[in-house]
């Protein structure tokens, strides 16, 4: 089965449409070259056609993540391509991070940052587009790429995108070609192997950062956390905490969106929502312990999601939000240490840092605060 991330299917559609536009025959599979000289992959294409008397082209692909419950599974992708003469083909960059020969448009259903209106697209996805489209570009031409995800807006409403400041659709934030199944035993095995490898390196200084998912990885890199210390964990946090202690980690930072890490504060250490949730219940419990008014506690308990509960609190009582999440960050550290010490005696220091819906580091436990301060980072107030 072709288990590729959404950016791969987007680039495959764009490449197919470009091939048709420059006169090449339609192929039901496109060869996609990967960054860093990795081997290329073959990606199925549904259809491709010329439009407007050959002035534009359109290709369609369907994302096959291989995961039955993945939000991008089966998503239809439309890639519109148009070439223009007189474009520049240098390596210069424009404001949105693309080379000046590539005019990228996030169409309907593609996520955009609410603050800037710019497309939410990872560097991996940008590189993938450039690597695969540039060789097809006629000399002296530039290319306009518009991506549309007809179901993107509806699918995104079932995610936490808005909590990261991303609106209007699905993010194109994959950091690799192949899908990592975050709740599978194979993913745990692979992550443990990566952890052991990092801890065995001569330059290892005893410090690691666990980031949760693609958004966590994206923000960790933007904040300048040491890349050689970062591991994307997926959902197997409990076993990985123990593995970190077993491999001699001295300082561990848990860095992520509160929607995932909230579960740790309630003692839930496998965080995939199909296996364990309880976030509203945990949030309600913490609000009670912090002495939040009964009316607000009742609103929280009846919320349909953590995000909605937060929005309610932010409007009605911003001070309560700060109290709840500060307590939560501390509880994450306490519960995580207790979890590790259930299985082995360890002096590993565990810190937690949570970011908010505006993609800002907002809350940290005492150990988390020490660790980010040592890196020259401060919390947003």
UniProtKB/Swiss-Prot annotation:
Catalyzed chemical reaction(s): Co-precorrin-5B + S-adenosyl-L-methionine = Co-precorrin-6A + S-adenosyl-L-homocysteine
InterPro entries reported for this sequence: CbiD, CbiD_sf
Keyword ATP-binding on entry: no
Biological pathway: Cofactor biosynthesis; adenosylcobalamin biosynthesis; cob(II)yrinate a,c-diamide from sirohydrochlorin (anaerobic route): step 6/10
SUPFAM superfamilies the record matches: CbiD-like
EC number: 2.1.1.195
GO biological process: anaerobic cobalamin biosynthetic process; methylation
GO molecular function terms listed in the Swiss-Prot or TrEMBL record: cobalt-precorrin-5B C1-methyltransferase activity
EC class (word): transferase
Keywords on record: Cobalamin biosynthesis, Methyltransferase, S-adenosyl-L-methionine, Transferase
Family from the record: Belongs to the CbiD family.
PANTHER family named in the record: COBALT-PRECORRIN-5B C(1)-METHYLTRANSFERASE
Entry protein name: Cobalt-precorrin-5B C(1)-methyltransferase
Lineage: Bacteria, Bacillati, Cyanobacteriota, Cyanophyceae, Synechococcales
